[in-house]
Each structure stands twice: as C-alpha cells, then as structure tokens.
C-alpha cells in the first residue's frame, strides 16, 4: 500500500491508538509494523483473530502483557553457550510468569481434555502450545532475589561461605569494638565509628597519631586531617574476609552457570513463548481497539463492493460524529458526491478509504454489523490542499501532479478517492477535465469516489450508466449541514436560499437568477423536486415505522394474553400431574404392604387363599391406577406431527420419563433419535412431548414384558444399600424395605454392602434372603465387586 495514501487517510493515527493498547515492547513493535494485507485468506484470518480475542475480553476480562521484557538478545547469548547474569535470568523468569498467566487465561484443561468453556477458536492453539516451564521458573525465583542479590539457599556451598563471612564479620566487629572502647586509643580517634576502605575495615585516626597507631593506612580524608587505618589486630581477619568474598563470587558464578545451562535446554520453547506472547499482545490490542471504538467485524468480498452501515470516522469525537451509510461497487462503480463545504463530503471519502485500510489490516471498523468491504491492492487518495511551497506549485498544479500519478498506476483492483476534482482553475475547464478523468476511470472499471461543486458532474452522473450521484444534506432552516450522505440524489446549490435567509434583498436575488441560464435553473428545479420527493418519502417511511411499532405493540399485548392463558393451562396440568402422583404413591404403598404380607405368609398352602385374594386386589388397584394415568395423559397430551420436530428441540420421552433433545429428524415411520445425557435412543414421535409446548401431564406407568411395573425416574432406587456399622436389628428392616422397593422398581439385581467384620451382619442378611420369596438367589461379591464385604442379590 502506497505511503502517500496511508498518510493522507491518517492511517498512522489509528496505529498510534492501537500501539497504546499493547502492553509489551514487542507487542507495540508489531503494532507499528502493521500494514494492510491484500490476500483474502490472510485478512479473514486476522479479522477472526480480532473477533475471538474480543469475545474472550468480554467473557474473561483483560489479559495483561504489561512489563514483558524483550529477551531476544539473551536467547542469542544462550545460542553461543554464554553464561547469563542474574538480571538476564530474571527477565526470562518474567517471560515465563507471563506465559503461565496467558496459558491459564486462554486454555483450561480438566482430566487432560479441553473443557467446553475453552471453546476452540483461532487463538486456542497458541494458548495450548505455550510452555510455562514452571520448574525452571521456580528454580530461578528460588535462587535469585534481585539483579544484585543471590539467595543464601541457592546452593549449599554459597550458604556455607556466607555463614563463614558472617562469623568473620562478627569477629572483626568484636575486635574493633574492643579497640574503640580502649582508653589508650580513644584520644587517637577522629570519630568512634567503623568504616570500610578498599574493601577492608578501618578506623578513622587523627593525622597526628597515624604513625603512633599500629596498623596499615588505606586512605585519608580530603583535608588530610583523618587517616583511615586498618588495625594490625584485624589484618588476618580482613584477609580471611577477602578470601571468603572471592569464594562467594565463585559460588555465585557457579549458580548462574548452572541456571544458564538449565535455561539453555529450553531455548526453543522460550523463543516460541516470546514470539507467541508478542502475537497475543498484538491481537488483544486489536480487540481492545475494537472495544473502545464499538466496532464490528466487516465481511469481505472479491467483487469490489463496499457497503458501510452507520459508519463512524474513528478520528472524530464520538460525541460529535454522525454515522453515514455508503455503498457502491455493485450497480455503480463511480460515486460523485456534491454538497456545501464542511458538509461532510471529505469525511465520507476518508471514511471509505480509512475503513478499507483498517479492514485489510485485520482491524474492526466502527460500523454496524453486516458492513461489507472489498480487497483493493492499492488505495489512491487526492484529498486536501497539498500545495508544495518548495516546488512553487499552485493548488491546481499540486493536485494535477498527484492525479497524473494516480492515473498512471491505478487499475481495476484499485480504489481511487478524489476531493474537489478539477478545482483551483477555470470552472469550465476544471469541470471538463474532471469529467474526462472520471470517464477514463469509469471505462477501466476502477472503483472511484469524487467530491465536486460542479453542476456538470451532476449531469454526467445522471446521464452515465454505472455512475451515481450523492449529496451531503444541508438544512436551509438552520443553515447547517446535517452530515447525512444521501446516495442517488445530486446536491442542490443552496446559495440563493441561504442568502435570502441571511437577509439579502429579494431584488438582488432575483437579479442573480436572471444571470444564470434557464437550463441551469431548470436543472436546479429538478434537483429541488427530487429533494421534495425524498422528504415526502422519508415522511411516509416514518409513518410506516410508526404503524409498524403500533402493530408490534399489539402483537406484544396479544402474546402477553396468550402467555396468561398458557400459564392457566400449565397450572391445570400441574394440578392433574400432582393428582397422578398421589394415585401412583397410593398404588406403591398398597403394593408395598401386599408384598410384606406375602413375605409374612410365606409359601405355606394354608395361606394360599388369602394370598390369592390380595393378588387380585393388587391387580385391580394397579389396573385402575394405570388406566387413570394413561387416560389423563392421552387426554391432555397434544398429538404431534413429524413436521413439529426439529433438531435440537427439548422433548419428554413418556415411556422412560426422561428429558432429552432431538438429534435427528423423524423418518417415514415417525421414528427419530433422542439424546438423553449419554444415552441415545430411537423413539417414535407418539412417545414424545415437546417440553416448551406442554407441561408433562403424568409420569408414565408402562407395563414391561414380564408384567411387573416399572416405576418413574422420580421413584427410582439406588442399585446398592450400605448397612456397614448397623446392628442386626437395625439393618434387617432397612434390608427388607430396600428389597421391596428394588423389586417393585424392577431392578434385576442389587448389591448389599455389609462389610467383613465378624460376619454376623452378613449371616443375618443371608438368612433373611433365604426367607424372601421373590429373591431368585444371592452370592458374595467377586474380585472388583467388593469381595466378601458385599452380597449380590438377584430377583425372580
């Protein structure tokens, strides 16, 4: 993209806004290097990255890249095997800390599988491949406190040396303290302090005593009144301290070398982390800019078609900017904009040009969703007064020089923008030149926008296929532009109307009208009529919008009324459902009692008659319950057609009393697949209810093939009973009740967990199972089932 267009359209100001949102120096570097792209796939990729980052910003908040250092030079030193300093290692630690922060922000894992919250997008892989290298980072942080300080615990050797240094220091201070407090030396001291000179402990001795005091002189004050002397009593200790300092430095260098070797093994991961963090910083800066500008992702096409919906120039104060709609490149490829000065013509040009540059650079544009941009290899712009004083060029010459260059280089893949084409010279010749230039560009099918004051160009646009007029609206009443762009309508000269409004006499205005040609006045009358028609159309449109709002309000009230009716219906159905639950509970209680009696009577023949009577009563009771519930359900349930079901609908599977979602459309027989949790089953539509249409009437009671009753899910029972810790007299009633419920729920087998212990509880359970008639058999658990701590019970 040519530099002149970038400068003219103020693209660099957008880049400055973008760079300010990057947190790291490398991120800002990438922002400053951003230029428009020309490959569709690259542009779409960058746009999607910006959108995905924006989605994450709204979902999780900001991700900080602030303070991430540039370690490129450090990595180059690692390449040649150099040992790093403490400061360099701390920079690497900062990068690794930022890497971990980014990893946690962008990629969540659970059980080694990506969670649903961490949705796949264009950024997921970047986050996933980041390597925080936590062991290395922790080791650096453990060993290095700051650029000037290594931790005592960095190595046993360093800890030992520093302990010896402390001991030696203490000895020196003890010895010097004795000297300071000695009566024989108090008079020799300039000050009663201990000082350091050339790395050795000294005392400040008065100049006249420097030869009397026993020791080695290392320095003297600037006035010569004080000599700094190392007492002979601590010379040996000072020597030891110097040796220990050398050993300390050797230990530190050893620690830094070991850390450098450790870091060098991961230099490629470090390089990837640095590069990826810079890219993410760059991407999230683009997302932040989109958020600040309230922008949206534009759609792109290869048809050179532009359709900007409510576009706002990003460099104009958001409180003052007026959104504009601009479209061209479909039915017409040349747009001629007319209107008053300061009316918004130039802003319209710059908006189209700047949006094109921003979009092709992967930036969102401040416009409504659904806006479209096209890809142009070059954008050429001749906007504003670019007169060159150095070259002594007039305004016209300057613009014409630029125009000549544009005509030489532009092709059908270019976007050309002219502001006041042909201005700065004789109006007749200027208009002729402007028409010739636009005609030339139009013949070559080059997408062009041009602003003008010339009426001849309005006529050119009206009479030429593929060319359209547009104007910036001006209010004669307020004498102010509205900044609205009206496509399809040429701009009308408002000079006479404005002059009259400002008080110019009618005589002068009428005299002026005589000086313009009848043809020109007729043309202005046509434009006036068009403007009047447009205003009338907008009035009709406003009335239609009002009618639409009234209809919507009526629809809303009707929906509220229907909602109240539905609520009443739902209440009635809930009451019916509760009644069904009551009937079902009564049937269950009756069945429980009957089974207990059956167990009590046992298999003896004397009680056969009583048992048979109870069976008959139970069958009658359950039959009544079943018929009652089924009839209520069928009466209240809507019969659905195959066309009523769509993939994703929430449904109630009546026979299973489970909720699920439709995963396929019904086949010719009315069968479709329903996903119920991890279960996917083929179900006929006659066995389904749409949950959002009708509240479930009753929990279905369906007969199984064996004739037993399968209870609803709400009355389902656990497949195991834990009685560990219970006494026999406490456990057996629980076992008895549990077996009854499990048998009624039609469980094929259950597990009783009694534990090993003394075996008394297991024996009591086994004895009880032998007396239970509907138990087919039992056994202790096998390997993996609980062994002798559980009993597996199988029902008849």
From Swiss-Prot:
Pfam families: MSSS, MutS_V, Smr. It comes from the Bacteria. GO terms for biological process: mismatch repair; negative regulation of DNA recombination; rescue of stalled ribosome. Residues 721-796 form the Smr domain. GO terms for molecular function: ATP binding; ATP hydrolysis activity; ATP-dependent DNA damage sensor activity; endonuclease activity; mismatched DNA binding; ribosomal large subunit binding; rRNA binding. Keywords: ATP-binding, DNA-binding, Endonuclease, Hydrolase, Nuclease, Nucleotide-binding, RNA-binding, rRNA-binding. InterPro entries: DNA_mismatch_repair_MutS_C, DNA_mismatch_repair_MutS_core, DNA_mismatch_repair_MutS_sf, MSSS, MutS, MutS2, P-loop_NTPase, Smr_dom. Residues 620-644 are annotated as: Disordered. ATP binds at residues 339-346. Its EC number is 3.1.-.-, 3.6.4.-. CDD domains: ABC_MutS2. Coiled coil: none annotated. Belongs to the DNA mismatch repair MutS family. MutS2 subfamily. Homodimer. Binds to stalled ribosomes, contacting rRNA. Endonuclease that is involved in the suppression of homologous recombination and thus may have a key role in the control of bacterial genetic diversity. This is Endonuclease MutS2.
């Amino acid at each position: 993209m040519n530099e002149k267009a970038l400068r003219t359209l103020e693209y660099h100001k957008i880049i400055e806004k973008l760079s300010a949102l990057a947190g790291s120096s490398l991120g800002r570097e990438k922002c400053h290097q951003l230029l428009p792209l020309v490959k569709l796939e690259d542009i779409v990729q960058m746009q999607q990255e910006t959108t995905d980052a924006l989605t994450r910003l709204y979902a999780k908040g900001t991700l900080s890249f602030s303070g991430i250092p540039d370690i490129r030079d450090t990595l180059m030193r690692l390449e040649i095997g150099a040992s790093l300093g403490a400061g360099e290692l701390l920079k690497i630690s900062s990068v690794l800390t930022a890497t971990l922060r980014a990893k946690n922000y962008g990629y969540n894992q659970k059980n080694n599988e990506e969670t649903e919250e961490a949705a796949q997008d264009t950024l997921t892989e970047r986050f996933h491949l980041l390597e925080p290298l936590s062991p290395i980072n922790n080791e650096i942080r453990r060993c290095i406190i700051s650029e000037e300080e290594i931790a005592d615990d960095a190595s046993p050797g360093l800890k030992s040396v520093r302990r010896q240094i402390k001991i030696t220091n203490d000895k020196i201070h003890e010895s010097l303290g004795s000297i300071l407090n000695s009566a024989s030396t108090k008079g020799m001291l300039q000050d009663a302090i201990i000082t350091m000179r050339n790395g050795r402990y000294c005392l400040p001795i008065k100049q006249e005593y420097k030869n009397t005091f026993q020791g080695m002189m290392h320095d003297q004050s600037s006035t010569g009144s004080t000599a700094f002397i190392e007492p002979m009593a601590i010379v040996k200790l000072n020597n030891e301290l110097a040796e220990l300092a050398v050993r300390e430095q050797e230990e530190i260098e050893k620690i830094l070398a070991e850390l450098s070797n450790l870091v060098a093994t991961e230099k490629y991961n470090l390089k990837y982390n640095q590069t990826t963090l810079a890219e993410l910083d760059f991407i999230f800066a683009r997302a932040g800019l989109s958020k600040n500008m309230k922008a949206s992702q534009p759609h792109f096409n290869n048809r050179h078609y532009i359709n900007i919906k409510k576009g706002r120039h990003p460099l104009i104060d958001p409180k003052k900017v007026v959104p504009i709609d601009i479209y061209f490149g479909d039915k017409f490829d040349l747009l001629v904009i007319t209107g008053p000065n300061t009316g918004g013509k130039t802003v319209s040009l710059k908006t189209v040009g700047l949006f094109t540059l921003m979009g092709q650079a992967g930036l969102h544009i401040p416009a409504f969703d659904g806006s479209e941009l096209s890809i142009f290899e070059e954008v050429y712009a001749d906007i504003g007064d670019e007169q060159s004083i150095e070259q002594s060029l007039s305004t016209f010459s300057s613009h014409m020089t630029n125009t000549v260059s544009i005509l030489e280089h532009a092709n059908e893949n270019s976007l050309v923008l002219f502001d006041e084409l042909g201005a700065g010279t004789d109006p007749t010749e200027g208009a002729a030149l402007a028409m010739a230039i636009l005609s030339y560009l139009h013949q070559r099918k080059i997408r062009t926008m041009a602003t003008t004051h010339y009426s001849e160009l309005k006529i050119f646009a009206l009479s030429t296929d593929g060319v359209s007029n547009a104007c910036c609206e001006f209010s004669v009443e307020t004498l102010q532009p509205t900044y609205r762009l009206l496509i399809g309508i040429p701009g009308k000269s408002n000079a006479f109307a404005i002059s009259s409004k400002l008080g110019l006499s009618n005589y002068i205005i009428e005299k002026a009208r005589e000086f313009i040609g009848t043809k020109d006045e007729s043309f202005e009358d046509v434009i006036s009529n068009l403007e009047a028609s447009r205003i009338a159309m907008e009035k009709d449109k406003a009335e239609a919008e009002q009618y639409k709002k009234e209809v919507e309000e009526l629809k809303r009230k009707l929906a509220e009324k229907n909602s109240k009716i539905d609520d009443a219906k739902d209440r009635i159905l809930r009451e019916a459902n509760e009644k069904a639950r009551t009937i079902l509970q009564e049937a269950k209680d009756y069945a429980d009692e009957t089974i207990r009696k059956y167990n009590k009577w046992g298999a003896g023949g004397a009680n056969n008659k009583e048992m048979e009577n109870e069976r008959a009563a139970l069958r009658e009771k359950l039959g009544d319950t079943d018929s009652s519930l089924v009839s209520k359900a069928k009466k209240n349930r809507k019969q659905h057609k195959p066309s009523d079901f769509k993939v994703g609908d929430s449904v109630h599977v009546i026979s299973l009393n489970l909720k699920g979602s439709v995963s396929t459309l019904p086949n010719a027989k009315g069968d479709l697949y329903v996903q119920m949790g991890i279960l996917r089953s083929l179900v006929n539509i006659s066995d389904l209810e749409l949950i959002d249409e009708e509240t479930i009437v009753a929990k279905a009671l369906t007969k199984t093939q064996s004739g037993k009753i399968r209870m609803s899910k709400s009355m389902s029972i656990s497949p195991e009973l834990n009685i560990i810790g219970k006494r026999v007299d406490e456990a057996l009633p629980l076992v008895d009740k549990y077996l009854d419920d499990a048998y009624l729920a039609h469980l094929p087998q259950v597990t009783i967990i009694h534990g090993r212990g003394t075996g008394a509880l297991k024996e009591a359970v086994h004895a009880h199972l032998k007396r239970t008639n509907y138990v087919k058999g039992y056994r202790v658990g096998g390997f993996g089932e609980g062994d002798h701590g559980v009993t597996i019970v199988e029902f008849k």
